[in-house]
From Swiss-Prot:
Its EC number is 4.4.1.21. It comes from Aeromonas salmonicida (strain A449). PANTHER family: S-RIBOSYLHOMOCYSTEINE LYASE (PTHR35799:SF1). Belongs to the LuxS family. It catalyses: S-(5-deoxy-D-ribos-5-yl)-L-homocysteine = (S)-4,5-dihydroxypentane-2,3-dione + L-homocysteine. SUPFAM superfamilies: LuxS/MPP-like metallohydrolase. Involved in the synthesis of autoinducer 2 (AI-2) which is secreted by bacteria and is used to communicate both the cell density and the metabolic potential of the environment. The regulation of gene expression in response to changes in cell density is called quorum sensing. Catalyzes the transformation of S-ribosylhomocysteine (RHC) to homocysteine (HC) and 4,5-dihydroxy-2,3-pentadione (DPD). Homodimer. Binds 1 Fe cation per subunit. Its cofactor is Fe cation. This is S-ribosylhomocysteine lyase. NCBIfam families: PRK02260.1-2. The lineage of its organism: Bacteria, Pseudomonadati, Pseudomonadota, Gammaproteobacteria, Aeromonadales. Fe cation binds at H54, H58, C128.
Length: 169
């Protein structure tokens, strides 16, 4: 099985909250697609709550589009990581980490403006696979934590696992 890009970086050295360019690729039509690792939690030390990450998934995707789309950027998808330490964001374009971090920070402020569970987008059995598994309070806690800690940058060259280490794992 091929080694995926996300498993070639040292998770013990990642900082959070932080933005990382996980992958950049070109389509046959020469469009740039960039995948960002939006790390909310320090791996193996913190984890996003089940209900909080689910509610954040519903809110974050729209708010990030409000703040990041335009000027050569269009978000394709934002999805939670299975390890529940962050989200992957795929987009057309190549914004720098500072622009992504500023949009992320603004989106977290937007999350805090949602005051009622009923205001969570697509919170119904027709549009959500587990519509009863939400917590606006936990999503607010996640947003407050990100805003309090600030958003940094994780660099691949600083996190790359040496070839010898990869072979030994």
């Amino acid at each position: 099985m091929p080694l995926l890009d996300s498993f070639t970086v040292d998770h013990t050295r990642m900082e959070a909250p932080a933005v990382r360019v996980a992958k950049t690729m070109q389509t046959p039509n020469k469009d740039t697609i960039t995948v960002f690792d939006l790390r909310f939690c320090v791996p193996n030390q913190e984890i996003l709550s089940e209900r909080g990450i689910h509610t954040l998934e519903h809110l974050f995707a729209g708010f990030m589009r409000d703040h990041l789309n335009g000027n050569g950027v269009e978000i394709i998808d934002i999805s939670p990581m299975g390890c529940r330490t962050g989200f992957y964001m795929s987009l057309i374009g190549a914004p720098d980490e500072a622009r992504v971090g500023a949009a992320w920070q603004a989106a977290m402020s937007d999350v805090l403006t949602v005051q009622e569970q009923a205001k969570i987008p697509e919170l119904n059995e027709y549009q959500c696979g587990t519509f009863s598994m939400h917590s606006l309070e936990e999503a607010h806690e996640i947003a407050r934590n990100v805003l309090a800690r600030g958003i940094g940058v994780n660099h691949n060259d600083e996190l790359a696992l040496p070839e010898e280490k990869l072979k030994s794992l």
